[in-house]
Amino acid sequence: MAKAAIIGLGRSGIAAARCLKRDGWQVTLSDRSDSPSLQATKTNLEREGIIVNLGQNLSLEASDLPNLIVVSPGVPWDAPILITAREKGIDTIGELELAWRYLQSSPWLGITGTNGKTTTTALCAAIFQKAGLNAPSCGNIGYAACELALKADKYDWIIAEISSYQIESSRDLSPKIGIWTTFTPDHLSRHQTLENYYQIKASLLQRSDRQILNGDDPYLRQIGVSQWQQAYWTSVQGKAALLGDPSRGVYLQDNWIVAFGELIAPVNLLKMVGSHNQQNLLMAVAAARLAGIEKKAITEAIATFPGVAHRLEYVCTYKGLDFINDSKATNYDAAAVGLQSVPSPAILIAGGEAKAGDDRAWIAEIKAKVATVLLIGDAAADFARRLQSAGYQDYECVETMDRAVQRAAELGPAKEAKVVLLSPACASFDQYPSFEHRGTHFRQLSLQL
């Protein structure tokens, strides 16, 4: 019996294990963590005949090696155990690649980029599904990809949000359509250099039959048609700003979306704020038209699209203050976009687990629009120093989300603020398991005011 080792007892790892077990593999799942909830999951999986090892890493010391290793997205591709596995000739892949092996008979729409992936993925799914297609979203949102394989449905399209981590471990995944939303420095602690990060992202587009790129992203625009001669480009700046052949472009003209020379819909049908969300919409429309979806379905989907949780999500209004949850803004560029999208003066809640990157545009937005910054998490002291050195004095280190929300409500009237914006510019892992948990906590606290 062929043997498979799965690393990571999360949703992706469990789905991968069940796929392989169903196909007759002997499956061992390992996770270096241990907790009562994981113990309960272990008990359930072992009833299914899946071996689960908690509190330990995979070992390749024994002579009885696995034929296949599947890694969850959070496991670094350059982890020593994975380097050793590849040196030993063991087939080593990510969960998304395993799903591709099961589901490659269906066309895939793959969306990657530093920022904008989730909203673009959600917009694509809404449009494709409004057209009556069986087109679930997976990857970073929706299902784990292997959960779709377990369903054994016939999918018209698979719409996958794909991170750089997942691309690294998915060497054969080849979408019918690939979208690249944005490119700015992020995850450099894992990928080391901007060039490495770029090449990882680019590899997915290079394997895609058709490429859609955001012409309003400065880095992608700089690379331009020299590297992506056959791409379909988008721009909210109009036809004149398009790269490449305008007849293959999607752009805004007099507040209408124009795709490949045809009027599609008024852009103001989209309820989400911000130019960046219009950019996301244009890429989704480009994908829909390339997939043959009619204008009527596109228009209806845009008009009814509710937005995405944790991405400039309106939570409530308290004493004239709008509380906005932008917890997904985990780097400086995303947080700067968040500030650009809300009215001023704003009260900003920022901080968490800091990332490497260029904070200058973000700090410039703070100086232009923010009445007070409330700093939380591990980055609070460092952010305070940076704001001070930039000549910005109106900040407070409040440490926790509870204090931040309460303090924002207190300060709002005196500062004549219009909005309280959680847009952290940081990862969440110092205080929360994920940006979703952080945003949910902010939402709960805001609604309790």
From Swiss-Prot:
Keywords: ATP-binding, Cell cycle, Cell division, Cell shape, Cell wall biogenesis/degradation, Cytoplasm, Ligase, Nucleotide-binding, Peptidoglycan synthesis. Its main location: cytoplasm. ATP binds at G113, T114, N115, G116, K117, T118, T119. GO terms for cellular component: cytoplasm. It comes from the Bacteria. Pfam families: Mur_ligase_C, Mur_ligase_M, MurD-like_N. GO terms for biological process: cell division; cell wall organization; peptidoglycan biosynthetic process; regulation of cell shape. It is found in: Cytoplasm. It catalyses: UDP-N-acetyl-alpha-D-muramoyl-L-alanine + D-glutamate + ATP = UDP-N-acetyl-alpha-D-muramoyl-L-alanyl-D-glutamate + ADP + phosphate + H(+). The keyword Cell division applies. Its EC number is 6.3.2.9. Signal peptide: none annotated. Cell wall formation. Catalyzes the addition of glutamate to the nucleotide precursor UDP-N-acetylmuramoyl-L-alanine (UMA). Belongs to the MurCDEF family. This is UDP-N-acetylmuramoylalanine--D-glutamate ligase. It comes from Microcystis aeruginosa (strain NIES-843 / IAM M-2473). The gene is murD.
